[in-house]
Each structure stands twice: as C-alpha cells, then as structure tokens.
Amino acid sequence: MTRMRRHIPLLILFAATPVQAQLCNGVSVSIGKDGRALGHLPYGDAAPGTLVAAPAYLAVGPCRLRPEVIADLQRLIAAAAGDPAVQGRLYAFSCHRSLSHQQSTFCRTRESESGVDRAISAAPPGHSEHATGYALDFTVRPADGCPDAEACMAAKPAFRWLAANAARYGFEMSFPASNKQGVKWEPWHWRWVGVSRAAPGAARARFLFARARRDFAANPAVDPAPMIVPPAVVPTLAPAPAEEPIKGKRKKKDRRRDRGDRSDR
C-alpha cells in the first residue's frame, strides 16, 4: 500500500481527463490533465531508505533529507555562520514531508477555507517538493518577531545572503515573486539541484525537477539555461547590374577608329 501511495502522483499525471482528489473532509481539488493541482506539480514520496537525518546543529527540529543535500547544506550554513552580514544564524526546518504529513499540513487550516485558499499556504499532498527529499525551508535565529515560513523572511539580511550565495551550494528558490506557476512567493523554500549536473546526486534531482525548471524557472537559480540570442542579421546588398553599352555610341566610336586607321595607312 505504501508503495502504491508513492506512485499516486504519477498515476494522476498520466490521467486522460481531469480528476477530483478528495484531500480533506469536504474539500476536493481538481487535478488537471497536466497533473497540476492548484498550480502545484506532482511529486512522488521519497523512499525512507534514501533519506538520512541532518545533524542537529543544521536544523530546527527533526530534518530528513537526501545525503547529498546534507553535504551542501553543511557547507552553506558554515559559510553563512562565518559572514557577519547574515546577522543571525541560518537553519533548515521542515525538510522531507511524507504524503501523510503533507496532507495533515494542507488540512490543518480552518475548515471554512476552500482548497484554493489552503494551497496558498501549503501544497496539496502528492504535489509538494518536500516529498522528494531535495527541498527544505530555511529560517533564522534569533527570529526577531518573524515567524517561520512567512514573507517577513525576505526582509532579513539572512535572506539577502541566501539570494546572493545559495546557488553556489546547489540551492535555488522554487517559488519567486510573481512566478508563472501561480504559487505563492516563498522566500524560505529552496530546492537542491547540485552545483552542477556532475555533482553526486544532482542528475536525479534535476530529473525530478526538470519540468519545474523548464516551465517555471527558479530565481535565484543554479546555472539557469542560457538565453540564446540569434546573431544580428547584416543586410547584404546585391551588386549593381553592369551598365549595357549604348549601341549607337559604340558604332560612332568604331567609325571614328576606322577612319583613323585608314588615315594611318
């Protein structure tokens, strides 16, 4: 049963027609032909054996991620801790979420809210990057009155440091402001894709996020696809046609030359 639940997003993705998913008591969400629910792309749940616990000094509360993510997370947090411009300490929190955890998160809001309203704060289960084990939320301590996972994160020096440096450690911001995906701006939510495709584990992460990266670009992003600018077109001018000699003038010149030849004889 657990294995089947992990593959539910894939089954939804290949459905021929839109379906309705019952997520909470009295709340259903329409799943489009492209597999998206309320703007969110489908993702399967990471197998438990592919996740490891992050060291306690990296996170606020329990945090399980792919091991290759933790290696770069350690480097990022160490670099941030050594930079006084951060004005605090960065931590990870809310790392991997199972489908059941995501359902609990999605349904925890007020029962009066519609699925659309709920999706503003949380992705529907089966449609969260957190399920992959490659995504996490960042927070700062001391909090200074800014709750975790709130827009006030963007006003912190720590966020400005992330925006300038996170890509160097393989992290990119999934949901920038005014994103085409139609998902709420989340300055705290970052996914790992590796510093390059050749980095350990990066190829798999980039495969899982390929559609998101292609259709709904992260910003800041890791090695974004270069913009191909077509070469400037230099107009070429056709050579001017050669002027045809005027036959009348040629004959007159020929007659003059003939008279000159006869006089020389």
Predicted regions and their residues:
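Extracytoplasmic cell-surface/polysaccharide-interacting catalytic and binding patches
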Residues: 18-95, 99-265
